[in-house]
């Protein structure tokens, strides 16, 4: 799969600027009683990451969330959000 992420670009300190980006992976089709999302650790697997001459990933971490929406108080929805 190919995933794309949008990052707000702030170039105040160009060319030494830093951006903080997020990528949220989850499902709206199946809730937490049907699908399990269990990351092996809080670091994403970057083994297939292709480096860019324009930027570097300095740090990347992920968190698992269990979200309850007002429409469905007894149904948890799961996601993993990576920040980099």
From Swiss-Prot:
<keyword id="KW-1003">Cell membrane</keyword>
<keyword id="KW-0325">Glycoprotein</keyword>
<feature type="site" description="Confers toxin resistance">
    <location>
        <position position="66"/>
    </location>
</feature>
<keyword id="KW-0406">Ion transport</keyword>
<comment type="subunit">
    <text>One of the alpha chains that assemble within the acetylcholine receptor, a pentamer of two alpha chains, a beta, a delta, and a gamma (in immature muscle) or epsilon (in mature muscle) chains. The muscle heteropentamer composed of alpha-1, beta-1, delta, epsilon subunits interacts with the alpha-conotoxin ImII.</text>
</comment>
<dbReference type="GO" id="GO:0004888">
    <property type="term" value="F:transmembrane signaling receptor activity"/>
</dbReference>
<keyword id="KW-1015">Disulfide bond</keyword>
<feature type="site" description="Confers toxin resistance">
    <location>
        <position position="68"/>
    </location>
</feature>
<keyword id="KW-0770">Synapse</keyword>
<dbReference type="InterPro" id="IPR006202">
    <property type="entry name" value="Neur_chan_lig-bd"/>
</dbReference>
<dbReference type="GO" id="GO:0045211">
    <property type="term" value="C:postsynaptic membrane"/>
</dbReference>
<dbReference type="InterPro" id="IPR036734">
    <property type="entry name" value="Neur_chan_lig-bd_sf"/>
</dbReference>
<feature type="disulfide bond" description="Associated with receptor activation">
    <location>
        <begin position="71"/>
        <end position="72"/>
    </location>
</feature>
<dbReference type="InterPro" id="IPR018000">
    <property type="entry name" value="Neurotransmitter_ion_chnl_CS"/>
</dbReference>
<dbReference type="GO" id="GO:0005230">
    <property type="term" value="F:extracellular ligand-gated monoatomic ion channel activity"/>
</dbReference>
<keyword id="KW-0675">Receptor</keyword>
<comment type="function">
    <text>Upon acetylcholine binding, the AChR responds by an extensive change in conformation that affects all subunits and leads to opening of an ion-conducting channel across the plasma membrane.</text>
</comment>
<comment type="similarity">
    <text>Belongs to the ligand-gated ion channel (TC 1.A.9) family. Acetylcholine receptor (TC 1.A.9.1) subfamily. Alpha-1/CHRNA1 sub-subfamily.</text>
</comment>
<protein>
    <recommendedName>
        <fullName>Acetylcholine receptor subunit alpha</fullName>
    </recommendedName>
</protein>
<keyword id="KW-0812">Transmembrane</keyword>
<dbReference type="InterPro" id="IPR006201">
    <property type="entry name" value="Neur_channel"/>
</dbReference>
<keyword id="KW-1071">Ligand-gated ion channel</keyword>
<feature type="disulfide bond">
    <location>
        <begin position="7"/>
        <end position="21"/>
    </location>
</feature>
<feature type="glycosylation site" description="N-linked (GlcNAc...) asparagine">
    <location>
        <position position="20"/>
    </location>
</feature>
<keyword id="KW-0472">Membrane</keyword>
<keyword id="KW-0407">Ion channel</keyword>
<keyword id="KW-0813">Transport</keyword>
<dbReference type="Pfam" id="PF02931">
    <property type="entry name" value="Neur_chan_LBD"/>
</dbReference>
<keyword id="KW-0628">Postsynaptic cell membrane</keyword>
């Amino acid at each position: 799969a190919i995933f794309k992420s949008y990052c707000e670009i702030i170039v105040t300190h160009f060319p030494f600027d830093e951006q903080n980006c997020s990528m949220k992976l989850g499902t709206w089709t199946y809730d937490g009683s049907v699908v399990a999302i269990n990351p092996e650790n809080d670091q994403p697997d970057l083994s297939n990451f292709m480096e860019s001459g324009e930027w570097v990933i300095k740090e990347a971490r992920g968190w698992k969330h269990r979200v309850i929406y007002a429409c469905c108080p007894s149904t948890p929805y799961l996601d993993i959000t990576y920040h980099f």
